[in-house]
């Protein structure tokens, strides 16, 4: 909205307004807008969630120290998503289909998370939405992304560009790819996209178990993916760094900026001791958006490196459940991984800050793959 206002109308009367067409400037403006939106509306959102008694249901089989969190409002992810949506609509070029795909992903996965949170609150049951229904709708969202992105890729006039938008890029090697485009009807790409998005969504959700633990790594990874989207959306940088040039990705940078500002604004209230939790409505949507951006930029492997904390949390649950079913023994004292360290005697703040340090180091490592080709 504001992008169109400044670039297409006001610039006719005052030429400096045309600077808003710069992705770099709009990225900065988006961070500022989303950060201010989250911080300003945070107290009102928390007060409303308290008034309607949207309190967190704490599992009785988790760490005993978490029982003190009973009564803390949840579903704060609504604030994050609203901030992302508002700032994106303000500063992104809304003619770009990638922007709208990300907004639809945010709505679908956010709606599933909202339903899950609401059922937990209504029935005072931390299990929430029935797994079958939950994964059906998450699958719908992931398949929508895969199908939409493949359709856009298939409409490119240059077959080489279609392949660049579909094949899996292998970091560190300039010409190594996995030819997902080899399967007919985009099946390879769509199936792979399905697993990336659903895996990312659930991994972030599993990480969201301590005050501030998930949101700052989400910000770090969004920043890393923002660099990839900026580079791949600029033909000069893409050619120099040997990454696929995908023009649509320049506007994806704006969505990454919205996630950064909104996440930092939410952390203001989610830092220990948390005044509000994001809930599944935030975690599922943010994870799905990160996965979608990774697919859009063709940086799924770099994303797995940058989001290594999320991967470790998800794997810890898989290993714990698998080991218990097969051997009747636990691998960890408690899963997900952050609870294991709590059981070892680490304080919550120690776990969170140390995991943050690991997260930022992994993002730096992932960004290094840009140059090491």
Swiss-Prot record:
Pathway: Cell wall biogenesis; peptidoglycan biosynthesis. Its cofactor is Mg(2+). The keyword Nucleotide-binding does not apply. Keywords: Cell cycle, Cell division, Cell inner membrane, Cell membrane, Cell shape, Cell wall biogenesis/degradation, Magnesium, Membrane, Metal-binding, Peptidoglycan synthesis, Transferase, Transmembrane, Transmembrane helix. GO terms for molecular function: metal ion binding; phospho-N-acetylmuramoyl-pentapeptide-transferase activity; UDP-N-acetylmuramoyl-L-alanyl-D-glutamyl-meso-2,6-diaminopimelyl-D-alanyl-D-alanine:undecaprenyl-phosphate transferase activity. GO terms for cellular component: plasma membrane. The chain crosses the membrane at residues 28-48, 72-92, 94-114, 135-155, 177-197, 212-232, 252-272, 276-296, 301-321, 350-370. It holds the Pfam family MraY_sig1. Its main location: membrane. Belongs to the glycosyltransferase 4 family. MraY subfamily. This is Phospho-N-acetylmuramoyl-pentapeptide-transferase. The gene is mraY.
């Amino acid at each position: 909205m504001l992008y169109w206002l400044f670039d297409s109308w006001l610039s006719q009367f005052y030429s400096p307004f045309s600077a808003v067409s710069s992705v770099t400037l709009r990225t900065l403006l988006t961070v500022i807008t989303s950060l201010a939106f989250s911080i300003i509306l945070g107290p009102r959102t928390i007060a409303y969630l308290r008034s309607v008694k949207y309190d967190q249901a704490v599992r009785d089989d988790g760490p005993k120290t978490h029982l003190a969190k009973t009564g803390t409002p949840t579903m704060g992810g609504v604030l994050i998503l609203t901030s992302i949506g508002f700032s994106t609509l303000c500063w992104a070029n809304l003619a770009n289909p990638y922007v709208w795909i990300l907004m639809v992903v945010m709505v679908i996965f956010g709606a599933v998370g909202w339903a899950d949170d609401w059922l937990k609150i209504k029935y005072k049951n931390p299990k929430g939405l029935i797994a079958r229904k939950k994964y059906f709708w998450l699958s719908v969202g992931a398949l929508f992304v895969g199908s939409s992105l493949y359709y856009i890729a298939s409409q490119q006039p240059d077959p080489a560009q279609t392949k660049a938008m579909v094949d899996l890029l292998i970091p560190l090697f300039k010409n190594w790819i996995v030819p997902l485009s080899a399967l007919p009807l985009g099946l390879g790409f769509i199936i792979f996209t399905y697993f990336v998005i659903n895996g990312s969504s659930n991994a972030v959700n599993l990480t969201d178990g301590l005050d501030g633990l998930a949101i700052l790594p989400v910000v770090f990874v969004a920043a890393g993916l923002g660099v990839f989207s900026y580079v791949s959306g600029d033909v000069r940088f893409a050619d120099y760094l040997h990454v696929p040039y995908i023009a649509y990705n320049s506007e994806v940078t704006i969505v990454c900026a919205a996630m950064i500002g909104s996440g930092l604004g939410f952390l203001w209230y989610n830092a220990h001791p948390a005044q509000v939790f994001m809930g599944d409505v935030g975690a599922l949507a943010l994870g799905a958006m990160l996965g979608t951006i990774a697919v859009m930029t063709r940086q799924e492997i770099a994303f797995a490196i940058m989001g290594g904390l999320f991967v470790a949390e998800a794997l810890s649950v898989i290993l714990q459940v698998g080991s218990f079913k097969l051997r009747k023994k636990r691998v960890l004292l408690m899963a997900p991984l952050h609870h294991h360290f709590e059981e070892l005697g680490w304080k919550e703040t120690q776990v969170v800050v140390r995991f943050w340090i690991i997260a930022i180091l992994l993002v730096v490592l992932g960004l290094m793959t840009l140059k090491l080709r």
